Amino acid sequence: MSLEPFAKSEALTFGVELELQLVNRHDYDLASASADLLRMLRGKETPGDIKPEITESMIEIATGICHSHDEALWQMREIRDRMVEAAVPLNIGICGGGTHPFQQWSQRTISASPRYQYISELYGYLAKQFTVFGQHVHLGCPSPDDALYLLHAMSRYVPHFIALAASSPFVQGVDTGFASARLNSVSAFPMSGRAPFVLTWDAFVAYFEKMRATGVIESMKDFYWDIRPKPEFGTIEVRVMDTPLTVERAAAVAAYIQALGRWLLLDRPFVPTEDDYLVYTFNRFQACRFGLVGEYVDPASGQRGALADHILETSKLLAPHAEALASEGALDMVREVVERRDSDAEWIRATEGETRNLHETVRRGCGRWAQVASLPA
């Protein structure tokens, strides 16, 4: 199909999507329970949307269009609470985190959706391995050219987003040494990575049509880029974050992206260039591997420093924009997370270190998501 026109949207409005883990309450392994949970939720009013994902052990929640951090947080809390209530009679737990710590990908079941079945046929075992859990943030753009400007300007800050949300240190029972191992699964797909460097919508449409003519892609859904335009919504979609362990952190990360977008749009502090991507892969790896204690190379100056320092320096620039957006509390939370090196990945590691039991770690993760002190063992 041809690329749809870029829809009109209100600049800097945003929406949040979270992919969540469904686990049984027996041993806290993943459970193929999305259809049952959706049945329990039928007829219950919630803001936003709840829908299945590529495998039956996943479920996705999405807010509606939000103007503020408080609005997004309220919506996510409402959806969370309805889901947690609906899961109780099913003996199912729900938790965040970018990977399930000990699930075996071969045991997963692909959802019945025709698109997911097609992906499974095309990509083989990669589709089941794609049982990983991410946060996506859509940001409204005033024009299609502004969308491409924001996409490439924000690419400098992809390591910020990765490190702030990193929550996937374990894969198949093994500590990977990564803060965000989830993105290694995404990188296996051929249309992943960063978007091509084009700064006008006409040039992007020409690129899309060339790719479509090859038969490699059919729609924007076939691109798994770190940030991609979503013309049907009039947004860009930031896709690099793990799903945090709480809706509070998810909302703070989304508000950080909104404030960053406002600064970039209003101040235009730099013009993106192809050379910005010279250190893109290095910076991305540092954030995935080391999280908030990683290094960061400034694409403009070439200066190498601490990623945490770069986030804190950026947060100072964003302060007036956070104030204008009424998200000062979210920016304060981001600063506190960085200053304390308080990542969700380290919480998972610390909990496993204390309990020596990944099943117990997942159980406590479910409690953290549900905002209760503990859940039945």
Curated annotation (Swiss-Prot):
GO biological process, one term: modified amino acid biosynthetic process
Coiled coil feature spans: none
Gene3D superfamilies, per database record: 3.30.590.20
UniProt keyword annotations, A-Z: ATP-binding, Ligase, Nucleotide-binding
GO molecular function term, any single one: glutamate-cysteine ligase activity
EC number: 6.3.2.2
InterPro entries: GCL_type2/YbdK_subfam (IPR050141), GCS2 (IPR006336), Gln_synth/guanido_kin_cat_dom (IPR014746), YbdK (IPR011793)
Catalytic function, reaction form: L-cysteine + L-glutamate + ATP = gamma-L-glutamyl-L-cysteine + ADP + phosphate + H(+)
Domain of life: Bacteria
Family from the record: Belongs to the glutamate--cysteine ligase type 2 family. YbdK subfamily.
PANTHER family: GLUTAMATE--CYSTEINE LIGASE 2-RELATED (PTHR36510:SF1)
Function: ATP-dependent carboxylate-amine ligase which exhibits weak glutamate--cysteine ligase activity.
Protein name in UniProt: Putative glutamate--cysteine ligase 2
Protein's organism: Ralstonia nicotianae (strain ATCC BAA-1114 / GMI1000)
